[in-house]
Amino acid sequence: MALALASANSFLLPTKTHFALHVSPPPSKKTLLCTNPSSNFSFNKALSSRRRKQAWCVAAAADVKDATLLDGEEDQKVLVGPSSEQERKGEREVADYDWTEEWYPLYLTKNVPHDAPLGLKVYDKNIVLFRDGNDQFQCYEDRCPHRLAKLSEGQLIDGRLECLYHGWQFEGEGKCVKIPQLPADAKIPKSACVKTYEVRDSQGVLWVWMSRKTPPNVSKIPWFENFARPGFQDISTTHELPYDHSILLENLMDPAHVPISHDRTDWSAKREDAQALGFEVTERTDRGFAGWWGREKDGSKPNFLRFEAPCVLQNNREIVDKNGEINHFSGLFLCRPTGQGKSMLIVRFGATKRSPLIKLFPEWYFHQNASKVFEQDMGFLSSQNEILLKEKVPTKELYLNLKSSDTWVAEYRKWMDKVGHGMPYHFGHSTISLPEEPAVVEHAPAGLVAGLSASSPAKGGIGTMHAPNLANRYFRHVIHCKGCSSAIKAFQIWKNVLSGVVVALAALAILVSGRQWKVLLLASASLCSVGVYACSTAIAMNTTNFIRVHRRL
């Protein structure tokens, strides 16, 4: 998501402390291979997959001008290496960490349905969120204690959550208050209750505490000072994505890809602007890292990035106008893990001053443009996710992280080395822990059949699309956004009305005898047809994926 739009938060700006980003020694020449790609050369099969990324290939000088094989000294100039003396010595720092003792971003508060439960996930934990009779948020484990049916497939009756399988009803702290099949004189078993999770509303986002052993630590709920500033306004969107949250975070903290992958998607992305970037790490802790970045040729680093455990990324900037007033810009990314190969993202772009031109566009227009941005990266990131699972090695064996583009990515994977032992699974820079259960069964991702079979009453469908499908824009975003859902319904109503008017006007034009009346009626029908087309286009913009059109440059 165009990090060029993000900005620096004065609350988060630490005193600049320089950390030297040391680099690892180059691979020995024995592991380096060079060949003309046009030849029939194949890698030595004895070369393990984890070392293949060290095989360097360059084309013959006759084929590619100025092609050179990087030697060890040149490697040290461009590749990210050890970031501490401890890492240089091969020693690994490990921090205490328990993934359940964290607050995870669940949903934008304004988008939680009032009339239906909402099924969500944190890693492999299924939870259900709903508003009770007092409009308070409740969060339960998403399975009925009776026969394990998903409570998110149920309905709300008088503020109670009813399982639609047998009608058991639950309220408050997960207590069962009704079992239709019990005899009149029988008491409801005490064990007929559901597990609950603590939820809190903070700055327009609902957060869930996943530990059921440790009391919620409210001080861990992230607070974003820019969003509390007077006059600060933001555009917020939610997206489900078909790749792991760690891949998502990598992508979001990678400003170098924006000019290429998102070329001309908005004014800030142009492929001719792709260039070396400068990074300065100012903070490394067990909770994350922070630092400055900017274009190397400018010699300045005006953007401040902070990653905070478990899945919060913000990119901030301050711009002083000609009157000396500071305008605060923020790009906030809340990335919730929703299982292997899946994630949910809340994006919030905001500023204390916004261009008046923004008011000329409806909010759904910015939302569909955000969907387009994610679709431009979706194929790359999904395949990257698959390769990580297949190779089963740390990222340092697979990635070639450049100092001038990938510093944040390397920092993130090194942070995972510290804390990954306390996660359900992780892929760190030097360490990995694989999931206990595979993410796929035969050709289908785990949970796919149940997902496609679900009626998902809280989410609904459109046209012939009724089953959740993360490859489709409608199910990745629209079902999670009241604004876009309402816009599509309105466009559909107007389309139907205008279509009926077109037919009626055309019929009248045939029946009337006066030439002037015929012209007037046909002209009106034509205008209504334009309206039908506009409505169809708006619906398509919210429900149809972006298709990249290649062009010769």
UniProtKB/Swiss-Prot annotation:
Subcellular location: Plastid, Chloroplast inner membrane
GO cellular component, one term: chloroplast inner membrane
A Pfam family recorded for this sequence: PaO
UniProt xrefs under CDD domains: Rieske_RO_Alpha_Tic55 (cd04338)
Residues passing through the membrane, by range: 493-513, 519-539
GO biological process per UniProt: protein targeting to chloroplast; protein transport
Binding residue positions for Fe cation: 257, 262
UniProt binding sites for [2Fe-2S] cluster: 144, 146, 163, 166
Residue intervals annotated with topology Stromal: 61-492, 540-553
Positions of disulphide bridges: none
Keyword hit for Nucleotide-binding: no
Domain Rieske: 103-208
Cofactor note (record): Binds 1 [2Fe-2S] cluster per subunit.
Its job: Involved in protein precursor import into chloroplasts. Part of the redox regulon consisting of TIC32, TIC 55 and TIC62.
Name of protein: Protein TIC 55, chloroplastic
Organism, as annotated: Pisum sativum
Classification lineage: Eukaryota, Viridiplantae, Streptophyta, Embryophyta, Tracheophyta
Record gene name: TIC55
